[in-house]
């Protein structure tokens, strides 16, 4: 049974009438451009065919009823006429409440709604299950009540909800790609202007995501440290963000910076340049060059930005040994564990899967999780 069928059937059973709409919003993977988003730089993600699906209908009153199919059909109810505060017990409900609350601040011309939510974006894998939920809820209200909001506004609303209501400090990339993703394309995003450019993906290439299943422990504290060091670097160059510093300017005075800060700044500058070039390589179908850029990105994250772990490096090496120069592989996400992403000709996927199954657990003691994805369409009706 598809997520659409599941949520529609649950909706009819729970609420006693049929849903009028079913909306989906996808998760995402970032192909290249790591830690560049909060430096006003460039990222190159694609939406994936794992999504949050919501069957829904408008109500003729001011009540919101939400059922979470993936959490034993827990039900949350709240009113649009009372202050929206955090739910004491259901963390999932706070993503919904946060989106609704922040949407009221943007455009309060919507009424009540019934929703049943289900999703298959793996949680805790860095594939943006939370952003896909936020964008799905925003799209539900936009579609049901014909709100004059575009995908970028729905994305910004989701980011605000996560930052201010849920209390997690994320960039804009995850929500933006979920809202604006395009089938068979990646999206080059300028994180300063929020401008986007669709980049066609070569035919016959699979997007493979492999979760190392190494439990991330350092990610919060180390992420914040990296962010502060990048801000220190921007101040040193008297620029608003590292996006405004050229590699030539950096090389001329790198010796004056703290050596650790200098290495971390260098990663951001080189990664921005790689990301822009990667968009061109992909568009031209040059998988060999894309692979080189992904390899350089991984080396930079490992040696300059220092955010990989041995388990991730091992996974990358296993995949690289199989694909050679026919594709690319690198760590993706915040670092200190999580996933790797690989662009692989479809005919090589079984060989990669076999090599990883045979070697990764033997070398690390951890069993990986393997996902084969397609670049998918952003949020909308399904």
Swiss-Prot record:
Gene Ontology biological-process entries? galactose metabolic process
Q: Which Enzyme Commission numbers does its entry carry?
A: 2.7.1.6
Q: Which residues bind substrate?
A: 34-37, 223
Instruction: Note the site residues: Transition state stabilizer.
Output: 28
Q: Which catalytic reaction applies to this protein?
A: alpha-D-galactose + ATP = alpha-D-galactose 1-phosphate + ADP + H(+)
Tell me the route in metabolism or biology where this protein functions.
Carbohydrate metabolism; galactose metabolism
According to its UniProt record, where is this protein located? Answer: Cytoplasm
Gene3D superfamilies listed in its UniProt record: 3.30.230.10, GHMP kinase, C-terminal domain
Keywords annotated in UniProt: ATP-binding, Carbohydrate metabolism, Cytoplasm, Galactose metabolism, Kinase, Magnesium, Metal-binding, Nucleotide-binding, Transferase
Residues the record lists as binding ATP? 124-130
State the family it belongs to: Belongs to the GHMP kinase family. GalK subfamily.
Protein's UniProt name: Galactokinase
Provide the species name. Answer: Shigella dysenteriae serotype 1 (strain Sd197)
């Amino acid at each position: 049974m598809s997520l659409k069928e599941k949520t529609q059937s649950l909706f009819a059973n729970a609420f006693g009438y049929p849903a009028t709409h079913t909306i989906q919003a996808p998760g995402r993977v970032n192909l290249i451009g790591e830690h560049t988003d909060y430096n006003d730089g460039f990222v190159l993600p694609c939406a994936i065919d794992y999504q949050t699906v919501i069957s829904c209908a408008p109500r003729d009153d001011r009540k919101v009823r939400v059922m979470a199919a993936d959490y034993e059909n827990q039900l949350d109810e709240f009113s649009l006429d009372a202050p929206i505060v955090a739910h004491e017990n259901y963390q999932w409900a706070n993503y919904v409440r946060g989106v609704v609350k922040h949407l009221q601040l943007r455009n309060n011309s919507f009424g009540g709604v019934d929703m049943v939510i289900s999703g298959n974006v793996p949680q805790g894998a860095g594939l943006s299950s939370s952003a896909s939920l936020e964008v799905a809820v925003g799209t539900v209200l936009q579609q049901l009540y014909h709100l004059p909001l575009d995908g970028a506004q729905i994305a910004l609303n989701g980011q605000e909800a996560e930052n201010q209501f849920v209390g997690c400090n994320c960039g804009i990339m995850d929500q933006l790609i979920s809202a604006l993703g395009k089938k068979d394309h990646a999206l080059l995003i300028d994180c300063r202007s929020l401008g986007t450019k669709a980049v066609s993906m070569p035919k016959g290439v699979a997007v493979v995501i492999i979760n190392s299943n190494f439990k991330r422990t350092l990610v919060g504290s180390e992420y914040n440290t990296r962010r502060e060091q990048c801000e220190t670097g921007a101040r040193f160059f008297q620029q608003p963000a590292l996006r405004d510093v050229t590699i030539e300017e950096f090389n001329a005075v790198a010796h004056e910076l703290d050596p650790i800060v200098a290495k971390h700044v260098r990663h951001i500058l080189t990664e921005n340049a790689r990301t822009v070039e990667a968009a061109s390589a992909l568009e031209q179908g040059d998988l060999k060059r894309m692979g080189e850029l992904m390899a350089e990105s991984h080396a930079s994250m490992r040696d300059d930005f220092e955010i990989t772990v041995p388990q991730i490096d091992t996974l990358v090496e296993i995949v690289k040994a199989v694909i050679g120069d026919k594709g690319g592989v690198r760590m993706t996400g915040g670092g200190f564990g999580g996933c790797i992403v690989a662009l692989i000709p479809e005919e090589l996927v079984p060989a990669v899967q076999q090599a990883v199954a045979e070697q990764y657990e033997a070398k690390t003691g951890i069993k990986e999780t393997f996902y084969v994805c397609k670049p998918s369409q952003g949020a909308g009706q399904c």
